[in-house]
Regions:
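Small cysteine-rich, disulfide-bonded extracellular modules of the LU/uPAR three-finger superfamily
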Residues: 1-95, 102-143
Length: 143
């Protein structure tokens, strides 16, 4: 089993089908569940799964809802981002995460995050800090 960071192939197609709305006002609901190192997630992941999702204090299935940042452009690159998200006072060990669209039929996947190694919190904050929202670093970039 492995987690491979990737923009999900199904998401690329669904952009052209207008299944995802990243506008901050009135947009889709995006969630971010966390996964153990036993999860198998990558570019071929098409939807949220409970298989190998973490459990722990102050963690609920499907993870946190994400706060969207309106899409923008920089040069010829379109981009969007999310606000950092925190599971407060939690006890969690996770190797990666999946961003998915909860409003789309079937909880369709957007992208997979690989933390590179297990990350843990013990009665503390578990935070995912998203990169700078620019054409080189934003979590979702289309060049």
């Amino acid at each position: 089993m492995a987690i491979s960071q990737a923009m999900c192939t199904s998401f690329k197609k669904e952009i052209l089908e207008a299944k995802h709305n990243f506008l901050n006002s009135g947009g889709s609901t995006f969630k971010i569940p966390l996964y153990t190192s036993s999860a198998s997630l990558g570019a071929t992941t098409t939807a949220y799964t409970t298989s190998n999702e973490v459990t722990g204090t102050n963690y609920t299935a499907k993870g946190n809802s994400l706060t969207r940042v309106d899409p923008s452009t920089s040069g010829t690159t379109a981009l969007t981002d999310f606000a950092d998200t925190t599971w407060s006072s939690s006890t969690i060990t996770a190797r990666g995460a999946l961003i998915f669209n909860e409003d789309a039929s079937g909880d369709t996947s957007v992208l997979v995050l690989d933390f590179g190694a297990d990350k843990s919190s013990s009665s503390g904050d578990f935070t995912i800090q998203f990169p700078t929202a620019d054409s080189s670093n934003a979590i979702i970039r289309i060049a």
